[in-house]
């Protein structure tokens, strides 16, 4: 199952971003979680 890399478009309600990243609800792309 492929995950979405940094700055990939994503769906906040179905977050498929890679580990350590989270789908940003406002910008709709994967951002690092610090």
Swiss-Prot record:
The record's misc note reads: Negative results: has no effect on voltage-gated potassium channel human Kv11.1/KCNH2/ERG at 17 uM.
| Free-text note regarding domains | The presence of a 'disulfide through disulfide knot' structurally defines this protein as a knottin.
What does this protein's UniProt record list under function?
Spider venom neurotoxin that blocks voltage-gated sodium channels Nav1.3/SCN3A and Nav1.8/SCN10A in human (IC(50)=2 uM and IC(50)=4 uM, respectively) and rat (IC(50)=2 uM and IC(50)=2.5 uM, respectively).
Q: Give the species this sequence originates from.
A: Pterinochilus murinus (Mombasa golden starburst baboon spider)
Which family is this protein grouped under? Belongs to the neurotoxin 10 (Hwtx-1) family. 34 (Jztx-26) subfamily.
Q: Which GO terms describe its molecular function?
A: ion channel inhibitor activity; sodium channel regulator activity; toxin activity
Q: What is this protein called?
A: Beta-theraphotoxin-Pmu1a
Which residues in this protein are found as Leucine amide? Answer: 34
